[in-house]
Regions:
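Active-site or pore-adjacent capping/gating segments
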Residues: 80-138, 142
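Generic serine detector
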Residues: 28, 43, 48, 68, ...
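Alpha-helix capping/termination and helix-coil
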Residues: 22, 59-62, 106, 110, ...
Length: 231
Protein backbone atom coordinates (compact mmCIF):
# COMPACT_ATOMS: atom_id res chain seq x y z
CA UNK A 1 0.00 0.00 0.00
CA UNK A 2 1.73 3.18 -1.22
CA UNK A 3 -0.97 5.53 0.04
CA UNK A 4 0.63 8.40 1.94
CA UNK A 5 -0.59 8.82 5.55
CA UNK A 6 -3.08 11.65 5.98
CA UNK A 7 -3.68 11.68 9.73
CA UNK A 8 -1.64 11.49 12.91
CA UNK A 9 -3.22 8.10 13.67
CA UNK A 10 -2.01 6.70 10.35
CA UNK A 11 1.49 8.03 10.92
CA UNK A 12 1.61 6.50 14.41
CA UNK A 13 0.35 3.17 13.09
CA UNK A 14 3.14 3.07 10.53
CA UNK A 15 5.67 4.09 13.15
CA UNK A 16 4.51 1.27 15.42
CA UNK A 17 4.98 -1.32 12.66
CA UNK A 18 8.35 0.14 11.70
CA UNK A 19 9.57 0.04 15.30
CA UNK A 20 8.48 -3.60 15.58
CA UNK A 21 10.51 -4.51 12.51
CA UNK A 22 13.58 -2.32 12.97
CA UNK A 23 15.09 -1.82 16.40
CA UNK A 24 17.05 1.40 16.11
CA UNK A 25 17.04 5.04 17.14
CA UNK A 26 14.35 7.34 15.76
CA UNK A 27 13.36 10.99 15.59
CA UNK A 28 10.69 13.19 14.07
CA UNK A 29 11.05 15.65 11.19
CA UNK A 30 8.52 18.47 11.44
CA UNK A 31 7.70 21.97 10.19
CA UNK A 32 6.28 23.80 13.21
CA UNK A 33 8.42 26.88 12.67
CA UNK A 34 8.28 27.23 8.90
CA UNK A 35 5.29 29.29 7.76
CA UNK A 36 2.67 29.10 10.54
CA UNK A 37 4.34 31.62 12.87
CA UNK A 38 3.85 34.38 10.29
CA UNK A 39 0.63 33.35 8.57
CA UNK A 40 -1.22 32.11 11.64
CA UNK A 41 -0.36 33.72 14.96
CA UNK A 42 2.65 36.06 14.70
CA UNK A 43 2.79 36.54 18.48
CA UNK A 44 4.56 33.13 18.51
CA UNK A 45 2.79 32.13 21.75
CA UNK A 46 0.46 29.43 20.43
CA UNK A 47 3.06 27.80 18.22
CA UNK A 48 5.53 27.79 21.13
CA UNK A 49 3.08 25.82 23.25
CA UNK A 50 2.31 23.42 20.40
CA UNK A 51 6.02 22.83 19.79
CA UNK A 52 6.58 22.21 23.50
CA UNK A 53 3.75 19.68 23.79
CA UNK A 54 4.83 17.86 20.62
CA UNK A 55 8.42 17.59 21.82
CA UNK A 56 7.23 16.26 25.18
CA UNK A 57 5.18 13.65 23.32
CA UNK A 58 8.12 12.18 21.41
CA UNK A 59 9.13 9.80 24.20
CA UNK A 60 5.55 8.54 24.37
CA UNK A 61 5.79 7.20 20.82
CA UNK A 62 9.35 5.96 21.16
CA UNK A 63 11.23 8.79 19.44
CA UNK A 64 14.34 10.46 20.82
CA UNK A 65 14.52 13.86 19.14
CA UNK A 66 13.34 16.19 16.41
CA UNK A 67 14.76 17.68 13.22
CA UNK A 68 13.07 21.05 12.90
CA UNK A 69 12.61 22.15 9.30
CA UNK A 70 12.21 25.84 9.98
CA UNK A 71 13.14 29.40 9.21
CA UNK A 72 16.51 30.28 10.69
CA UNK A 73 15.61 33.92 11.33
CA UNK A 74 12.70 33.47 13.70
CA UNK A 75 13.43 35.77 16.61
CA UNK A 76 10.88 38.57 16.24
CA UNK A 77 8.90 39.31 18.35
CA UNK A 78 10.65 36.75 20.59
CA UNK A 79 12.79 33.60 20.51
CA UNK A 80 10.26 31.69 22.59
CA UNK A 81 9.48 29.00 19.96
CA UNK A 82 13.08 27.79 19.80
CA UNK A 83 13.49 28.16 23.57
CA UNK A 84 10.37 26.10 24.22
CA UNK A 85 11.53 23.40 21.83
CA UNK A 86 14.87 23.06 23.58
CA UNK A 87 13.33 23.22 27.05
CA UNK A 88 10.89 20.43 26.23
CA UNK A 89 13.64 18.18 24.86
CA UNK A 90 16.17 18.58 27.67
CA UNK A 91 14.36 20.22 30.59
CA UNK A 92 11.83 19.16 33.17
CA UNK A 93 9.69 22.28 33.52
CA UNK A 94 6.09 22.70 32.40
CA UNK A 95 5.27 24.92 29.44
CA UNK A 96 3.90 27.64 31.74
CA UNK A 97 7.11 27.57 33.77
CA UNK A 98 9.20 27.65 30.61
CA UNK A 99 7.26 30.61 29.23
CA UNK A 100 7.62 32.56 32.48
CA UNK A 101 11.33 31.74 32.66
CA UNK A 102 11.88 32.96 29.10
CA UNK A 103 10.14 36.30 29.52
CA UNK A 104 11.95 36.98 32.78
CA UNK A 105 15.30 36.25 31.13
CA UNK A 106 14.52 38.25 27.98
CA UNK A 107 12.75 41.28 29.47
CA UNK A 108 13.74 41.29 33.13
CA UNK A 109 11.18 42.98 35.38
CA UNK A 110 9.15 43.95 32.30
CA UNK A 111 8.65 40.33 31.28
CA UNK A 112 5.08 40.28 32.56
CA UNK A 113 4.08 43.32 30.51
CA UNK A 114 5.64 41.89 27.36
CA UNK A 115 3.94 38.52 27.83
CA UNK A 116 0.56 40.10 28.62
CA UNK A 117 0.70 42.14 25.43
CA UNK A 118 1.65 39.17 23.28
CA UNK A 119 -1.18 37.21 24.86
CA UNK A 120 -3.56 39.92 23.62
CA UNK A 121 -1.97 39.69 20.19
CA UNK A 122 -2.46 35.92 20.23
CA UNK A 123 -6.10 36.34 21.29
CA UNK A 124 -6.72 38.69 18.38
CA UNK A 125 -5.33 36.37 15.73
CA UNK A 126 -6.95 33.25 17.17
CA UNK A 127 -10.35 34.87 17.74
CA UNK A 128 -13.40 33.46 15.97
CA UNK A 129 -13.75 36.74 14.09
CA UNK A 130 -10.24 36.53 12.63
CA UNK A 131 -10.45 32.81 11.88
CA UNK A 132 -13.67 33.18 9.93
CA UNK A 133 -15.79 31.29 12.46
CA UNK A 134 -18.11 34.24 12.99
CA UNK A 135 -20.02 36.27 10.42
CA UNK A 136 -20.78 39.01 12.94
CA UNK A 137 -19.06 42.14 11.62
CA UNK A 138 -19.51 43.93 14.91
CA UNK A 139 -17.54 41.16 16.64
CA UNK A 140 -14.73 41.60 14.12
CA UNK A 141 -14.53 45.35 14.64
CA UNK A 142 -14.60 44.90 18.42
CA UNK A 143 -11.62 42.58 18.10
CA UNK A 144 -9.82 45.16 15.94
CA UNK A 145 -10.59 47.95 18.41
CA UNK A 146 -9.43 45.87 21.38
CA UNK A 147 -6.18 45.02 19.64
CA UNK A 148 -5.62 48.65 18.67
CA UNK A 149 -5.96 49.58 22.36
CA UNK A 150 -3.47 46.86 23.33
CA UNK A 151 -0.99 48.21 20.78
CA UNK A 152 -1.38 51.74 22.12
CA UNK A 153 -0.96 50.55 25.71
CA UNK A 154 2.25 48.63 25.06
CA UNK A 155 3.60 51.55 23.01
CA UNK A 156 3.19 53.79 26.05
CA UNK A 157 4.59 51.24 28.51
CA UNK A 158 7.77 52.53 30.23
CA UNK A 159 10.17 49.69 29.45
CA UNK A 160 13.42 50.02 31.41
CA UNK A 161 15.75 47.35 30.02
CA UNK A 162 18.92 46.48 31.89
CA UNK A 163 21.72 44.86 29.91
CA UNK A 164 22.11 44.01 26.24
CA UNK A 165 19.71 41.06 26.22
CA UNK A 166 16.82 43.06 27.63
CA UNK A 167 17.58 46.02 25.35
CA UNK A 168 17.49 43.80 22.28
CA UNK A 169 14.31 42.07 23.43
CA UNK A 170 12.55 45.41 23.88
CA UNK A 171 13.82 46.66 20.52
CA UNK A 172 12.43 43.61 18.72
CA UNK A 173 9.11 43.83 20.55
CA UNK A 174 8.76 47.50 19.59
CA UNK A 175 9.46 46.62 15.97
CA UNK A 176 6.69 44.03 16.15
CA UNK A 177 4.31 46.59 17.63
CA UNK A 178 4.99 49.14 14.90
CA UNK A 179 4.49 46.53 12.19
CA UNK A 180 1.26 45.38 13.82
CA UNK A 181 -0.05 48.95 13.94
CA UNK A 182 0.57 49.35 10.21
CA UNK A 183 -1.03 45.98 9.53
CA UNK A 184 -4.08 46.63 11.70
CA UNK A 185 -4.92 49.96 10.08
CA UNK A 186 -4.68 48.32 6.66
CA UNK A 187 -6.76 45.34 7.76
CA UNK A 188 -9.43 47.62 9.22
CA UNK A 189 -9.65 49.47 5.92
CA UNK A 190 -10.08 46.17 4.10
CA UNK A 191 -12.87 45.13 6.48
CA UNK A 192 -14.57 48.48 5.86
CA UNK A 193 -14.55 47.77 2.14
CA UNK A 194 -12.01 50.44 1.23
CA UNK A 195 -9.28 50.17 -1.40
CA UNK A 196 -6.11 49.13 0.43
CA UNK A 197 -3.71 49.01 -2.52
CA UNK A 198 -1.67 52.01 -1.38
CA UNK A 199 -1.83 51.07 2.31
CA UNK A 200 -0.70 47.53 1.59
CA UNK A 201 2.26 48.72 -0.45
CA UNK A 202 3.18 51.14 2.34
CA UNK A 203 3.08 48.28 4.85
CA UNK A 204 5.27 46.07 2.70
CA UNK A 205 7.61 49.01 2.17
CA UNK A 206 7.89 49.44 5.94
CA UNK A 207 8.85 45.77 6.30
CA UNK A 208 11.39 46.04 3.47
CA UNK A 209 12.94 49.23 4.81
CA UNK A 210 13.63 47.57 8.13
CA UNK A 211 15.21 44.47 6.62
CA UNK A 212 18.85 45.66 6.77
CA UNK A 213 18.48 46.27 10.50
CA UNK A 214 16.29 43.31 11.38
CA UNK A 215 17.34 40.65 8.87
CA UNK A 216 19.12 38.66 11.60
CA UNK A 217 15.84 38.30 13.46
CA UNK A 218 13.08 38.11 10.86
CA UNK A 219 12.70 36.82 7.32
CA UNK A 220 11.04 39.74 5.52
CA UNK A 221 9.88 37.61 2.59
CA UNK A 222 8.02 35.15 4.80
CA UNK A 223 6.72 37.99 6.96
CA UNK A 224 5.16 39.65 3.91
CA UNK A 225 3.75 36.34 2.69
CA UNK A 226 2.09 35.87 6.08
CA UNK A 227 0.61 39.37 6.00
CA UNK A 228 -0.70 38.80 2.46
CA UNK A 229 -2.75 35.91 3.80
CA UNK A 230 -4.80 38.38 5.86
CA UNK A 231 -5.00 41.15 3.28
Amino acid sequence: DNKYPATAAEYLDRLKHWQAAIHTDGFSFDYHLMTFPYGGDPSFLKISEVVYEDMKGLKTVGLNGNVSCQLQRLLLPTSLPNYAMAAALVGGKTYAETETEYFAAAFGKDGGAAKDFLRKSESFYLSDAMRGKSDDKSELFRAIDDYACALDEISAYPFAPSGETEKLSVKLLKRYVETEKAFLSTYRAKCEGRDITAAREKLFGFIDEGEPEYERFEDALFKKDGVKGWL
